């Protein structure tokens, strides 16, 4: 009888130890899964700084690791191109560390204005910013959103210049060009490096229109393709047609003066 009790006790002890081991293993596995989930979240957040968050989410969800698995799609997109007026002269006057701080503040404020109006920043080009509206998701109001973003950028620069003045730094001026057209949107590049981009003459024309802001002495210019999508609340001035490099026909643009305010808000 004593032997049977002893054997039963040993069996129960073995079962208990096995249960404890399984519980320990389950707890350890749960910790490992939690750690892996946190690492994945951090990785996605880091990648979202290099590519639009919507693209990163799709890559993860679809397990895409080759460019060919997510081919570019033909889309109609509104492109916004902006850069700093007089950047070269400013970069020669300021210490490199100060210049970097000024640029970072500029990029952050401009990016915020773009994101708040359903756009996404594609890339920074020196002091330039290239952004798209309607590239990631269909957006019937993409052109109006782009112009609202440009007006928000104008206001943000005015606020930033007051801050720069308090620090004894020169004010920034910007020129913004906006154009709407067709092209291919998707992942472009090699196996080693790829980026989400929009390929087509739309981007080139947006950049050319931006350069015309200096010619016409204004800060925001849009093409006829954009103007045709805007409602009467936007106040525009037609500019003389100009020939630009790479475009066969003279380009007609419109300067954006502002926009009527929605009820209860200030005008742009």
Language-model features: locations:
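Regulatory cytosolic signal-relay segments
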Residues: 3-74
């Amino acid at each position: 009888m004593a032997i049977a009790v002893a054997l039963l006790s040993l069996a129960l002890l073995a079962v208990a130890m096995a249960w404890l081991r399984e519980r320990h293993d389950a707890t350890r596995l749960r910790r490992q899964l939690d750690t892996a989930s946190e690492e994945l979240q951090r990785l996605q957040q880091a990648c979202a700084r290099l590519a639009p968050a919507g693209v990163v989410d799709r890559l993860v969800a679809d397990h895409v690791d080759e460019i060919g698995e997510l081919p570019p799609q033909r889309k109609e997109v509104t492109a916004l191109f902006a850069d700093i007026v007089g950047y070269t002269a400013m970069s020669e006057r300021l210490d490199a560390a100060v210049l970097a701080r000024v640029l970072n503040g500029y990029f952050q404020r401009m990016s915020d204005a773009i994101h708040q109006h359903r756009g996404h920043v594609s890339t920074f080009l020196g002091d330039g910013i290239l952004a798209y509206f309607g590239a990631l998701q269909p957006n019937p109001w993409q052109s109006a959103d782009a112009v609202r973003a440009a007006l928000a950028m104008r206001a943000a620069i005015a606020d930033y210049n007051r801050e720069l003045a308090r620090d004894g730094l020169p004010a920034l001026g910007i020129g913004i060009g906006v154009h709407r057209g067709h092209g291919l949107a998707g992942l472009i590049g090699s196996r080693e490096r790829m980026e989400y981009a929009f390929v087509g003459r739309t981007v080139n024309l947006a950049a050319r229109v931006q350069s015309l802001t200096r010619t016409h002495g204004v800060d925001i210019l849009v093409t006829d393709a954009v103007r045709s999508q805007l409602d009467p609340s936007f106040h525009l001035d037609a500019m003389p047609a100009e020939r630009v490099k790479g475009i066969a026909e003279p380009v007609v643009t419109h300067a954006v003066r502002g926009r009527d305010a929605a009820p209860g808000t200030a005008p742009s």
